[in-house]
């Protein structure tokens, strides 16, 4: 089993440096570790589509974004992914519980 601490270090080693998402109890360990590390800013979002927008802005500003969310939030962000990220080929790593 991969711990949240090891996983967060792997993400950092791959250059991911911007994190956002809707808080989720299943991802709370990873969110806590990321939020406590000054190298990995975490910005909580109120909805998944808003988090997609934050990731897009971060990518355009030179960051490598990660979106953390529950699987139930996928429907909320499909329009943002298809009308923004897909069209302009803006990558976002999605970690879904």
Summary of predicted features, one role per range:
Residues 1-97:
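Thiamine diphosphate
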């Amino acid at each position: 089993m991969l711990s949240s601490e090891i996983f967060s270090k792997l993400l950092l080693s791959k250059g991911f440096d911007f994190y956002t998402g809707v808080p989720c109890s299943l991802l709370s360990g990873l969110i806590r570790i990321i939020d406590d590390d000054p190298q990995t800013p975490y910005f909580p979002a109120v909805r998944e589509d808003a988090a997609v927008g934050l990731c897009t802005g971060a990518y355009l500003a030179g960051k490598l974004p990660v979106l953390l969310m529950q699987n139930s939030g996928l429907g909320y962000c499909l329009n943002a992914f298809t009308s923004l990220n897909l069209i302009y080929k803006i990558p976002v790593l999605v970690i879904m519980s």
